[in-house]
């Protein structure tokens, strides 16, 4: 499943919409997403699953590039 993650780059930053970044990640669950991103110390605001029509829309209208976490 593909997830869209809204985050701030620094854990100490107060969330400000203009500074929010987005990445797309393939994972089995929201917990799996958070586990994979834990080592980056991001301030994760929201994790959203992207499926069906929403996924097609993101592919056509957004820069949907899956992040590879090693």
Curated annotation (Swiss-Prot):
Keywords, sorted A to Z: DNA-directed RNA polymerase, Nucleotidyltransferase, Transcription, Transferase
Entry's Gene Ontology molecular function annotations: DNA binding; DNA-directed RNA polymerase activity
Coiled coil: none
Pfam families the record matches: RpoY
Gene Ontology CC terms, in alphabetical order: DNA-directed RNA polymerase complex
InterPro entries (alphabetical): RpoY
Enzyme Commission designation: 2.7.7.6
UniProt keyword Transcription, yes or no: yes
UniProt-listed GO biological process terms: DNA-templated transcription
Family of this protein: Belongs to the RNA polymerase subunit epsilon family.
HAMAP family: RNApol_bact_RpoY
Function: A non-essential component of RNA polymerase (RNAP).
Protein known as: DNA-directed RNA polymerase subunit epsilon
Protein species of origin: Bacillus cereus (strain AH187)
